[in-house]
From Swiss-Prot:
Keywords for this protein: Hydrolase
SUPFAM superfamilies, sorted: Nudix (SSF55811)
Record protein name field: RNA pyrophosphohydrolase
Family, similarity comment: Belongs to the Nudix hydrolase family. RppH subfamily.
Keyword tRNA processing attributed: no
Stated role: Accelerates the degradation of transcripts by removing pyrophosphate from the 5'-end of triphosphorylated RNA, leading to a more labile monophosphorylated state that can stimulate subsequent ribonuclease cleavage.
UniProt motif Nudix box: location: 39-60
Cofactor needs: a divalent metal cation
Listed EC numbers: 3.6.1.-
Domain spans labelled Nudix hydrolase: 7-150
Gene (UniProt): rppH
Species this chain originates from: Legionella pneumophila subsp. pneumophila (strain Philadelphia 1 / ATCC 33152 / DSM 7513)
Length: 175
């Protein structure tokens, strides 16, 4: 776990989209809470390395299963409410500082596996409309989700264009 001087845990978030621009939305194991895949950086690990590790651990996908469409320009952060702070742990983590990645699924969704870890993060998942997570995520993560989705959404439109500015057809076909 990597924590900055201010007490924020360095973390990556993953927005995985399909050909219909719907996003992967996972239900946390044992909770009625939904979120994007995310996870902390290990010491010496880059954000991109952490992103691929978390993608595999939480969703069962590897580098060849996705295309990186982009990432947030800066780290986005949120503070944990007092009731979520773990006062008995050292160092005290007051929130998360996250680098967000927008990934396009380029393989079959049948490759998604939630059971590759001894303690899976998710027990269920579904595709939802691009902005639906903004309303469903737990309240203290909401602003970061809004910021990440707003910043990364234009990359979907850019990805659909050819060098001549024509829209790409849905699916694997190119216009």
């Amino acid at each position: 776990m990597v924590i900055d001087r201010a007490g924020y845990r360095l973390n990556v978030g993953i927005i995985l989209v399909n050909d219909s621009d719907r996003v992967f939305w996972g239900r946390r194991s044992g909770h009625d809470a939904w979120q994007f895949p995310q996870g902390g950086l290990a010491p010496g690990e880059t954000a991109m390395q952490a992103m691929y590790r978390e993608l595999h651990e939480e969703v069962g996908l590897d580098k060849g299963d996705v295309e990186i469409l982009g990432s947030t320009r800066r780290w986005l952060k949120y503070r944990l409410p007092k009731q979520y702070l773990r006062h008995g742990s050292e160092p005290l983590v007051i929130g998360q500082k996250q680098k967000w990645y927008l990934l396009k699924l380029v393989t079959s969704e049948q490759k998604v596996r939630l059971d590759l870890s001894d303690s899976p993060e998710f027990d269920s998942w579904r595709w939802v409309d691009f902005h639906e997570p903004e309303q469903q995520v737990i309240f203290f993560k909401r602003q970061v989700y809004i910021q990440a989705l707003k910043e990364l959404e234009p990359l979907l439109k850019k990805e659909r264009r050819t060098p001549y500015g024509l829209k790409r057809k849905r699916g694997n076909q190119r216009a």
